[in-house]
Amino acid sequence: DIKVDFIDNNEFVNRHHTPAFCWRYLVQKLNAKYGIFNKEKYNDILADAIFPKKTREKWVKYLNEQNYDIIITTASLSLRLGMLAPELNAKTIGWQHNCYAGYLDVPNVVFWKQECLLQEYLPKLDRYIVLSDYDKRDYKKFLDIDTEVKINPRSFVSERKCDPKSKRFLMATRFVYAKGLDLMMESFEEFCKQDDEWQLDIIGAGDLWNQIVA
């Protein structure tokens, strides 16, 4: 049987603008801009700013009461799960759905300027899963974190196949920075210097719509 729980995050988070709330907000903003708290000696400060201790205690209590066997999270939630893992009864798995660079090198996205936190908390998970051998290599090379590779399975098979002679590329995506639209367009421009008969069709919507169509 499959049971779906809809959890109201407001039950766990205090959003009132208290001095502590303002301090945590300031820490996150300063770190995102300058990386000043991205040091091992400041891990407790940055961790509390991202995921306050009182909030963590509420989540540990709730998750343990559910008697889960395994808890799986993705993206930035994997770091939070790592903070909870030592106090949870369940096995814990973090699973990233983008490349290493997409999580760590894109400004203000996912793990931007949080390398020291990752080094402390991701190893506390029972497993941390990445999508490719390149990601596994980079986590080990840059952060000395061991990961496990599981390639996303193909979710569907299409009976209709493209005609390679049509000279058209098709990209379907959200128009957001993290999807690498700028890299795609730069790559296509370089490609066209060698063969200008090809066409690139982009389907989607998002925050970068005006920049893409300009």
PLM features per residue range, with description:
Residues 2, 137-138, 201-214:
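Short, structured helix-loop element that forms part of the nucleotide-activated donor/catalytic region
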Residues 2-42:
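Conserved nucleotide-sugar phosphate-binding/catalytic loop shared by glycosyltransferases and other
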Residues 57-64, 96, 109-128:
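Membrane-proximal helix-turn-helix segments that form the acceptor-binding/catalytic region
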Residues 73-78, 96:
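Short His-centered aromatic/hydrophobic patch
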Residues 91, 100-101, 117-158:
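Donor nucleotide-sugar binding/catalytic pocket of nucleotide-sugar-dependent glycosyltransferases
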Residues 167, 171-190, 207-210:
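A conserved mid-protein helix/loop that constitutes part of the nucleotide-sugar donor-binding site
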